[in-house]
Amino acid sequence: MNNVILYCRPGFEKECSAEVTEKAAAREIFGFARVKDNSGYVVFVCYQHEEADRLVRVLPLRSLIFARQMILVGELLRDLPAEDRITQIAGMLTGAVAGAGEVRVEVPDTNESKELMKFCRKLTVPLRAALRAQRILKGEEHRSPQVIHVLFIAPGCCYAGYSYRDNHSPFYMGIPRLRFPPDAPSRSMLKLEEAFHVFIPADEWDERLGSGMYAVDLGACPGGWTYQLVKRSMMVHAVDNGTMDEALMATGQVIHHRADGFRFEPPRNNVYWLVCDMVEKPSRVAQLAADWLVKGWCREAIFNLKLPMKKRYEEVSQNLRLLIDHLQVNGVHGEVHAKQLYHDREEVTVHARRFWSAVPGRRDER
């Protein structure tokens, strides 16, 4: 197996390809990408067979902006007979996987592929039984290092391979399944909820997303992101010249500031979260978030960067470098991650966390 498949948002295959090629080369792993527009996935072919397995181990999925999932697969299985699709799939996995803990039969995130979802669900049960009989899969759901993936790209055509549990998305197809509450003022609240799932480990939610925290939402109206914070029992300063959702204001957890988000300064010293989903130039939003973190006005920030029509990977990379450089120059130790979420469109979501500052006299939590 020398192919690495990366799931991505349809229309962003070129960005995903450029990113994996660049970051693989930085680890001295070389190959080429096969890209089909609007397919929802990229195939990165490593020149050396053993390098593909190394790539899915050493390249953190978390470091990839445009990839939702990363799996190692063999060659495309074509024209699988309708009466027996399982034999060839099991044959591809034999010798490559032993004692995996889970099997996922998936499709790319396209309208055409979603027509195969019903078939994938039907195939999963007999495939699981066959793989268990051959000891490719353990006898019960198990947290084994490997997870088997079968990716159908068309009827009778699939890739079969695996991911490593410590470097993959835990979500089916790399997509968290979230419910839109009927009382939410905007579907944008799903972006922030997904960001929490992607960026914040579940065992740290009580500490970092806890009740009673203070947050600032810049560009808040009508209140989609504020809603998500309020549901987590936070106190929110919502900053926007527009009108906030009345039900949100009635909770007593929101203070509405009619102000420019780029000029607003927090009225408290204990704001933990900054969130921002303003339609602005990405460089301006990145600089704004960097300023908040450097000044110690917040401890963590989640914000969206709207993407241009062309050179989208270059634009994101440039703005992330701006943010990281600004923190480093000002002696702020932290971490920065970015991901194009399922609920994002022509944008990416960035998470930045401040640990401590080397400069005394700032609002700081050591």
Curated annotation (Swiss-Prot):
Q: Which organism is it from?
A: Sodalis glossinidius (strain morsitans)
Which classification does the entry list for the species?
Bacteria, Pseudomonadati, Pseudomonadota, Gammaproteobacteria, Enterobacterales
Gene that specifies this protein: rlmM
Keywords linked to the UniProt accession: Cytoplasm, Methyltransferase, rRNA processing, S-adenosyl-L-methionine, Transferase
Q: Which GO terms describe its biological process?
A: methylation; rRNA processing
The UniProt record lists the keyword Methyltransferase: yes
EC number of this enzyme: 2.1.1.186
The name of this protein is Ribosomal RNA large subunit methyltransferase M
Q: Known catalysed reaction(s)? A: cytidine(2498) in 23S rRNA + S-adenosyl-L-methionine = 2'-O-methylcytidine(2498) in 23S rRNA + S-adenosyl-L-homocysteine + H(+)
Homology family: Belongs to the class I-like SAM-binding methyltransferase superfamily. RNA methyltransferase RlmE family. RlmM subfamily.
